[in-house]
């Protein structure tokens, strides 16, 4: 049984053409831009509210970790990018460091499906959970996460 223990994502209609145009695939598996430039220019503080493009979610997580703003709104026209960010936050909340490293450092995690069901699913929206249930091979394949997405 899957359940969501918190709401971090607003509802969207995943059947709209503006979302289906991505063919159920994210474009970016990792972020190319360096968030240090953003920090230097934006000077994000604890009382700030940040609006940013999700992309692969790496800069979003960096803003939270480095600056601890009051709130971060991550948006992306491609809902699959948000599924990836949800997966990263779920992993950081529920998995030991070694497993997080396997998933996002090495890009391969043979036990991904089991971890998704037993540890990650409570931290995912139902749409993100369904997405990753249908993409468990992302972390099992010989290529791994960093050979997936539309920008490979």
Where on the chain are the PLM-derived regions?
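Conserved beta-strand positions in the Rossmann-like core of class I SAM-dependent methyltransferases
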Residues: 51, 73
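Short beta->alpha hinge that forms the Motif I/post-I loop of the SAM-binding pocket
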Residues: 55, 77
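A short acidic (Asp/Glu
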Residues: 60-66, 83-88
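Conserved alpha-helix/loop element of class I SAM-dependent methyltransferases that forms part
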Residues: 25-49, 58-62
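N-terminal, positively charged/glycine-rich alpha-helical extensions of SAM-dependent methyltransferases
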Residues: 1-20
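Alpha-helix initiation/capping motif
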Residues: 8-9, 34, 56, 96, ...
């Amino acid at each position: 049984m899957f359940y969501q223990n918190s709401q971090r994502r607003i509802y969207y209609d995943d059947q709209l053409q503006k979302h289906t145009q991505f063919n159920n695939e994210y474009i970016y598996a990792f972020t190319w831009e360096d968030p240090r430039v953003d920090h230097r220019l934006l000077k994000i503080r604890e009382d700030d509210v940040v609006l940013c493009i999700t992309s692969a979610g790496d800069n979003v997580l960096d803003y939270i970790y480095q600056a601890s703003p009051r709130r971060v709104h991550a948006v992306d026209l491609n809902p699959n990018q948000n599924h990836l960010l949800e997966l990263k936050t779920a992993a950081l909340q529920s998995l030991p460091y070694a497993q997080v490293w396997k998933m996002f450092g090495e890009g391969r995690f043979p036990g991904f499906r089991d971890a998704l069901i037993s540890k990650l699913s409570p931290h995912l929206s139902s749409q993100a959970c369904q997405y990753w249930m249908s993409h468990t091979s992302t972390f099992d394949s010989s290529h791994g996460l960093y050979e997936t997405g539309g920008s490979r």
